[in-house]
C-alpha cells in the first residue's frame, strides 16, 4: 500500500512539472486583505473577534514551516514541543498554561481541533504542513464553545476546501541531506460542476535523522510518515452542503534519541557501581562528536490514526443549521530507550488503543446584525485501553541485592554485547501498567452577542456538561523476588 501511494505521488508530481509555465503577472497593488476566521464557530472577520487570535494563512505555504510545531515562530505566547514516547505527540503551552500528556485519562488543557473534530489526546496532532488552509491560535479559556478541558486555548486547524469548479494538481518534492524526501500531492476534481467535487491528498515524509547510532551502525531519530485520504463535497442547492472527510496517517518515525554525553576519561566513567560502567556510553570515542549515540534501542514507533468527519450545513434566511459527526481511531505502539547507552538498563514499551466518537448539532442566528447567537448540543464518547511495560535492570538488581544496589556482590559478565549471565531470572521486565477507560459526555451550550454600538458589544455564554468516566487500572511488579 505504501509503495502504491508513493508511486501515485511521484506520478502526480511529474504531471505538475510538465504543465505549461504561465507568464508571471505584474505585482498587484498593496492591499490589506480581510482575514476570515471561525474561532467562534462562525465565519467572521478576525478584527471582529473579541478574543486574542492569531490566524496563520498564506504564510504557511511561503514559509519554512514543516510541521505544526514550527508555527510557534509566528504566534506569540505559543510554545510547541514534541512529546517523547507519544506518536507525533505535542506538548503545547499557551500563555504559560502547559499541556503535557502522561496518559490519556484526561483531555489536554490546550485543545486541538481539525475541521470541527476535537482531538481528545495529544497523540497524532503534530501534522505536517500539508493540505492546510489556515491555523488559528485561540488564547485563553475556550470552554463555552469548545468545552472539554480547554482552559489554556485552542489550535484550530482548517484543511483546504474542496473545489467544485476547477481541476487542479498541486504537488511538491523536497529532497535534502540525511535522506530527506518529502512528496506531497493534492488533486482536485469537480465531478459535477458547482454540485459535486472530490479532493484526494497524499504525503510521504522520510528522513534518516541527524544522529548516528554507532552501536546499531545507522542513523537514528528519523521520520517515516504516510498521510493520505479524500474529501467529498456535495452542494445540491444554495442551501444544503454535505462534506465527507476521511484520512489515514501511518507514523513509523523514531521518537527521538537520548544521547549519553559521558566519554572515557571523564569522572562519570571512572566510577563503577556494580562491577561495570553504569552506562556503556563510556565506551564511545571522545572524538565521535555530539551527533552520535551508542544505544541498543531504536525508540521505534508503529502508529496508525484514522479519522472520519461528516459535516452538514443547511443555510436559511434566518438560521444556519450545522451537524458534525466525527470518529477517530488510534492504534499506537512505541518503545523508548531511556538510558541512551548500549546496555539494556531502562526502557518502556507503550501500547495504546483509543477511539473517540462525537456528534455536534448547533444553530447560528442570521436574522439580525444587532443580536446574534450560537446554541447547540454536543455528545462525546471515548474508549481507551493502555498497556505499558517497564524494563528496569537497576530495579531487578536492587531486588537481588547486587553490588552498590544491595549487599555488595560483584556483578560480572555483563557487557554491551551480552546479557547478565548466571542470574536467576529470564527477563528484565520490572512492572506493567494497564488500564481501560470509557468516557461518556453530553453538553448544551450557547453564546450570545448583543452589538450595542459599533464600539461596544455585550457577550454572554454558558455551557452545561454532564460527564461520566469508568476507569479500571493497576500496576503490577514482576521479575525476580529473592
Describe the function of each predicted region.
Residues 211-219, 256-294, 337-347, 389-434, ...:
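Solvent-exposed loop segments that connect transmembrane elements
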Residues 107-109, 121, 130-139, 144-214, ...:
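Outer-membrane beta-barrel translocator/receptor signature
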Residues 171-175, 200-206, 244-248, 325-327, ...:
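Transmembrane beta-barrel strands of outer-membrane/channel proteins
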Residues 217, 223-374, 380-386:
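Outer-membrane beta-barrel domain signature, strongest for Gram-negative TonB-dependent receptors
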Residues 30-166:
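Acidic, small-polar-rich N-terminal luminal/periplasmic segments of exported/outer-membrane proteins
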Residues 63, 89, 109, 152, ...:
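Transmembrane beta-barrel architecture of outer-membrane proteins
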Residues 114-116, 175, 189-191, 232-235, ...:
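Residue-level signature of outer-membrane beta-barrel architecture
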Residues 71, 138, 158, 184-190, ...:
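Transmembrane beta-barrel domains of outer membrane proteins
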